[in-house]
Structures are given as structure tokens and as C-alpha cells.
Amino acid sequence: MLKPTAYLASAVAVVVVCLSSYSAPASAGNDGVVRLKSVYPIGETISRLKNDIAAKGIVFFSEVDQSQLAAGAGITLRPSVLLTFGNPPLGTQFITSNPNAGLDWPVRLLVFESEKGEVWTAYTDFGWIARRHGIKNRTAQFKMATEVIASITSAVTKK
């Protein structure tokens, strides 16, 4: 088992790597969802996001192809893929503050194609998650998570 200082060092290392390609975080709508348009086709968007996650040393947990699941149920759905990933030394701190925060961790990043054929990414704003779960003692960690997701999504929002 790692000591708390080792966890902190791991979290700081991930943030340092992430901030090297940092761009300002996007703002969420009233529903707490941040939506960002990708400049790449869906397959390349997913590949770029996964590569950026790996390059930052963040743990990639799963890729759920929702349109494939829908097809298996006889339902037509435009391309829609859910990526889950995270940095346990950072993310689990939120759950220690409120176990219900486990509903929002690991991080979920949706990549989908709109009716117009545009590719979008969407994720839940971390400030909104903090308010949802009444977590007030992890401000620095929520800021860090916001900076990390902004860095990851910047891999697909500009060429």
C-alpha cells in the first residue's frame, strides 16, 4: 500500500504532465455538462483522446461503444462512445469526502456524433460534481481535475 505522500506525488506528477498542454477549461451549461466540438472524425477523436490519456500516465478503464450496444438491441443510434479513465490517487479523494461521489468517478468522457455529423465531447463539470455531492474540502483537487480534463480535450478541439 502506498503512503499518502506517494499518492500525492503521483497526483502532482500527472498534473505537471497535463499542464504542459493546458488550455483554459470550458464552462458547463446549467445541466453541469461541458460540451466541446472536436475538429476530427469520431474514430480519430477517440484515438487522440486515448493516446493523450496514456501519454499523461492516467489509467484508462474502458471504452463503451453505445451505438454497438444499441444495434445489438435492434436500435439505431448515431456513433456514441463512453470513455472512462482516472488517476486513483486524485479521484478517490473525492469519494473519501462523500461516498456518493463514486457515482461520478472514474471520469466519464462521452464522444458522440450529432445529427449534423459533427463530433462532440461531453463530460460533467467538476465544480458541478462538487456541488452535487456537497464536497467543500477538496477545492484544489477539483481545480486540478478541471485542468486535467481541459488538457485532455484540447487534443481534439484544435489542430
In which residue ranges do the predicted regions lie?
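Bacterial N-terminal signal peptides that target proteins for export
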Residues: 1-11
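N-terminal signal peptide c-region/cleavage motif recognized by signal peptidases
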Residues: 18-23
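Terminal, regulation- and interaction-focused segments at domain boundaries
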Residues: 26-57
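Solvent-exposed, acidic/flexible segments
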Residues: 38-46, 63, 135-142, 146
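Extracytoplasmic/secreted envelope proteins and their assembly/folding machinery
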Residues: 43-46, 50, 67, 146-153
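Compact, glycine-rich, soluble single-domain proteins
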Residues: 50, 54-107, 111
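Beta-strand/loop substructures that line and gate deep hydrophobic ligand-binding cavities in soluble
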Residues: 108-135
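C-terminal partner/receptor-binding element of secreted or periplasmic proteins
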Residues: 126-159
